[in-house]
Amino acid sequence: MLAMQAQPLPKDPTIRTGKLKNGMTYYIRHNAKEAGLADFYIAQRVGSILEEPRQRGLAHFLEHMAFNGTKNFPGKGKRLGIVPWCETIGVKFGANLNAYTSIDQTVYHIGSAPLKRESIIDSCLLVLHDWSHYLLLEDQEIDKERGVIHEEWRTRRAGMAVQRLQEQAMPKVYKGTKYEDCLPIGSMDIVDNFAYQDLRDYYHKWYRPDLQAIIVVGDIDVDKMEKKIKKTFSSIPMPKGAAERIYYTVDDNEKMIIDIEKDKEQPIALCHIYQKREATPDSEKNTEKYLRDGYIDALISAMLNDRLAELRQLPVPPFQSATSRASQFFLSRTKDAFSLSISCKQDNILGGIVSAVAAAERARQHGFTQTELDRAKKLRLNAAERRANMQSDYRNSHYVNVCVDNFLEGEPLLSVDYKLEIAKKLDREVTLADVNAAVKELITDKNQVVVMYAPDKEGFEIPTEKQLEQIILAAQQQDYAPYEEAELAESLISSMPKAGTIVSEQPWRHGFTELTLSNGMKVYTKKTDYEADAVSLRMQADGGTSQYGDEDIPNFALISSGITEAGIGTFDAVTLRKMLTGKSVRVSPSVGSKGQSISGSASLKDMEVMFQLAYLYFTQPRKDTAAFASLMSRQRAFLANRNASPKVDYNDSIRAILYGHHPRMEPVVQQTLDKVSYDRILEIYKERFSDAANFKTVIIGNFDEQELRRLLCQYLAPLPATNKHEQTNYSRIPQIVGGEKLVKFSKPQATPLANVSIFLTADVPFTPQSDLELDFLRRCLSIAYTDSVREEKGGTYGVSVAFDLDKDDHPNTTLKISYNADPNRYEELNPIVYQQLKNIAENGPAASSMQKVKEYLIKQYAQVAITNDYWSYIIWHELDDDVDFDRDYCQMVEQMTPAAVQRMARQLLDAKRCIEVTMLSE
């Protein structure tokens, strides 16, 4: 048995792999799902852990420089740079062209490249070739990028206390190791001042073939691609006397390591308890034993998380939330750990930690039950079966990730079918005794590290390190009674409703069929094979909270959660979750300002369960005062320190200013909860779902049409109908105020930051043409901002541009421009942001930008038009707005003119409805 488990696993035969003489690895896979497209990646076993002290932050800096001049894509008027060249073929910077740097790896990619010409394939490979060894790293470009990196640091740290706290914790968690100070963003003092040669030294030392892999997946000829890879990359030299790539280890510790870090912008206390253990070496991962060990670890985590979720549902829950997992320790891949993560309540920090530790200790002492194991195994097997059923739908990115994980992490390179075979074998062979023996090894009281991130706030009592150590060790030494649970029912519905009928049926647009049920509900169905094992459901009706006066505002925010937290029918939320374990189904009700809806999705075999849940959410919402008390307790704990982050005050201010302090846009605070009525919530919910005839229902997927008709008659046609056909009361829907306004204020911020949001509104024709003009405008603006504010000025990590077009809003169009920057540069940068919009309004967008956007949108259409989500988007616009956003889309894109985009920009400016809300640092 042990010998068999140690045998190498069979490699996925659909993925071709090889190694060039210079040591470079390659992976190639044909995938026809995305016709005419391919992904090109270069993965590197190189990250910030390899930096020398004077190079802190340069691994990440180098990643940025890979887009700022290479041998064959120098830019600056010589030849196109990588970014502008990629955008000429519809590969958008950020969305399709990007990279990331972590502690141990760096990965670059060109995604969804259109293979319209052989030269595009050659050029994409040439980009990877240059990334490997031929970056220019020119002085001037390095200096320009310093500001961009600094603003990325500012953006990531501001409003993200956890990142700052993590940085503070690392020297204690990793004392005496390379991991003490190794986060990729690095030191801003070094980023701002390093010598050019330091960056070049890092590049030439670590970017080399033996640490690199080329990955190409898509609609390609594998044989031809292999020849191209060999031709393009074989000449890249492997340096002589190359430095050893060391994977730094983490020592064990006898005494518990405890670190408590505080931050004024941290809203809640988070406690992470790690129990360290040895990680499986990459060389030992390609074995059945590795899969078996991982399978058992996943079972244990799933079962323990179910128990922790039960504690969260108590009328007075001990914590906000708690989860367990078996994974890598903190940030180091050379050490694994079992971990507990507890989100604590301010008034019960120690009690919450003890409750989570006790749940883990109970599992260690007594193990799990056969019923729990059966559910957890069912969950794993169902997931494996679903992956096998869906493998024809996998996008290129799925196979790329498999290859990246194999090269960088040593994960087995297995076919989906073999994974299913192994899952079935493990399901049969792994016993309760196996799992309960493993849990005694996984969960321990040795080799522990405890990290707490807490608010730095007067009156917020934080335990001492000594207290944490004492209560955790004490909880681990106690004896606990075995876990018990009630027996589950066999089915969700004890008494089936009397079936209704389909009274009419007719073809509808875009391949949909319109069915009218006996209760008056209209159902629109479209059978697709875009996803082999998926069906989606959305039921929607007008009305929502607009049907109720302002006295009910406190209840609105808790309607959806108040219903789902109670479970459904005769089952509480915990029991319902257990009953649905192993089923691929999700159904959730929602009551919004304009309407109410039920959304769902399922695998084909669980489609009936999806309809049963929808039926129950209509007819049998459950009252559970204990569950609601639990929800309210957690909400109060969450809101206790809500305003710790300045971002919260900023977003509150935006809503208040935009909507003229409308009461329906006020945030939920502690005082709001004081006015909430559970009985009123239930009453509103029942009223919203009392008239099935007012609902339109859309079902899309690879369903059996006769089976779908049976389910419609059995579960949707019997739904009650009052035939009131309520409409949305738009007099109660908040609208953005008119006029021009600049609101600028300052608040203390841990990381000095200018937060800028600009909103321009106007009324434009609600047409596909207007929608497309707005899309072109925002994309052309984004290109202009990248060139001017980011690249030329080094003033921000990025400027975000978004728009909204809603038929029933007045004004119906909003263009939002937002960015973060150094507060000291606000006066310099903000005029540039406005000027770029004025430039388009006065002169039109650049012809090159228009062409880039056209290439991207046409390519994107081919990708999204083979998804169920796209057709859901199309039909709901037709049903709600009587507008076809699909008709002649590509033709409209091709025919879009700079003059049309210019006209839209001018219309937004001429409306003179511009509101800017800016928060600076005190």
Could you describe each region identified by the protein language model?
Residues 6-28, 221-309, 313-314, 374-378, ...:
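Proteolytic maturation boundary segments
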Residues 29, 34-51, 58-59, 77-130, ...:
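M16 family metallopeptidases and their MPP-like homologs
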Residues 141, 146-209, 215-217, 222-230, ...:
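Hydrophobic, small-residue-rich alpha-helical packing segments that form membrane-like cores
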